[in-house]
Amino acid sequence: MKPRKVMIIGAGNVGTAAAHAFVNQKFVEELILVDLNKERVEGNRKDLADAAAFMPGKMDITVRDASDCADVDIAVITVTAGPLKEGQTRLDELRSTSRIVSGIVPEMMKGGFNGIFLIATNPCDIITYQVWKLSGLPRERVLGTGVWLDTTRLRRLLAEKLDIAAQSIDAFILGEHGDSQFPVWSHSSIYGKPVNEYSLEKLGESLDLKQIGETARDTGFEIYHQKGCTEYGIGGTIVEICRHIFSGSQRALTVSCVLDGEYGESGLAIGVPAVLSQNGVKEIISLKLDEQEQQAFANSVSVIKKSIASI
């Protein structure tokens, strides 16, 4: 069996949190770290190797240049242009981050990369589309973490309100990984029942779905302002997506995908439900949205396309 290899490009907070999650779940044989700060990345390599030594089996933690990537299965891009300033949004990061990515991806393609790109760098949807354009790879092999973390937060919030397991909840967020994202309540259910039907039966009252959706959207910014970064949640998101790709789980996750006619749109990447396989995105699930959700999706598309046009 071919050893499974993941390269993490950017060994900052998100990259190292993802690396630690990979070590704990240990379903890859080699974890490769890439960072411009050679001293820091070597320190992280040693620290992670120590952590891996406590786990069963063998896992190699190595350091390479990004261009040394011909044998890599999944390349995770977590590079950042630096911390957000007060009042900035994810979209404010675009220009500086775009310049960094435009220097990395062509070098990787020259180095023979033929795997799958997973983008966690913000603004996720715009950078995912940029990486697809730069790489020349089929669109199914370039995806972003998108709104899978936001979807998971939504499920966690509902689970806490209802005192049930988050895995029992089918609820989704679609759109931009940012301010214009929205919950798809028309396709959300708990044990096969609409969310508020179940809530009325269990609690005797409806949940404030609007507030729950807003909380799911805003949690990332709250974490950032409280501790200076987000790392563990997105790190876990990266590892879960990779696990479903390697296993060929055929499970649908709301990740950022390049659209080509789905939802009547093209020329962008956006968070939608997608079935994952060992080749990346096997199928994009087109949900029939209600009128309000269609308007929200169109707004999110407009936000993303405006940013894409600026790079």
Swiss-Prot record:
Keywords of this entry: Cytoplasm, NAD, Oxidoreductase
Active site, per annotation: 177 (proton acceptor)
UniProt key word Cytoplasm: yes
Top EC category: oxidoreductase
Pfam family name, one: Ldh_1_N
Pathway: Fermentation; pyruvate fermentation to lactate; (S)-lactate from pyruvate: step 1/1
Broad class of where this protein is predominantly found: cytoplasm
Subunit field text: Homotetramer.
Family: Belongs to the LDH/MDH superfamily. LDH family.
Protein's UniProt name: L-lactate dehydrogenase 2
